[in-house]
C-alpha cells in the first residue's frame, strides 16, 4: 500500500491556465486563480483506502474525505458540485472520475500518483490535462 500521507509543496505546474480555460473560467478569474494557486500547500492523511486531503492557497482551502471505491461529493477545480468516484488505477495511482450534479460541462477527473518520492496530481477537462508535481516538506 503506497503512503500518500504527509505535507506536500508544489514543485511544478503545467497547463493550469489551459485547464481553467477549458472549464470556461473567464480571463480575469483565471489570472487570480493562477496567482493564488501558484504555491498550494497540501496535507494528506491516509488510513489504508481512507483519505483526507486538505489543499490550501491564499484564497481558498478545500478539504475532501473519501474511501477509494466509494463515491463522494466534492467540487470541481472551478467550484461546481460533483459526485466523484475514486478507484485504484494501479498500486500507486488513484483515478477519480467526476460527474456534475447540475448543468453541463466538460468531462472532468483527477489522479494522484506516487512516483520517485513525488506526488503527481493531474486534473483533466475533456482532452486538456494539467499536471502538478509535489515534493514532501
From Swiss-Prot:
GO cellular component terms attached to this protein's record: cytosol; nucleus; protein-containing complex
Domain of life: Eukaryota
Chain segments annotated as coiled-coil in the UniProt record: none
PROSITE patterns xref list: FABP
One Pfam family named in its UniProt record: Lipocalin
Function field: Cytosolic CRABPs may regulate the access of retinoic acid to the nuclear retinoic acid receptors.
Entry domain remark: Forms a beta-barrel structure that accommodates hydrophobic ligands in its interior.
Annotated protein name in UniProt: Cellular retinoic acid-binding protein 1
Source species of the chain: Bos taurus
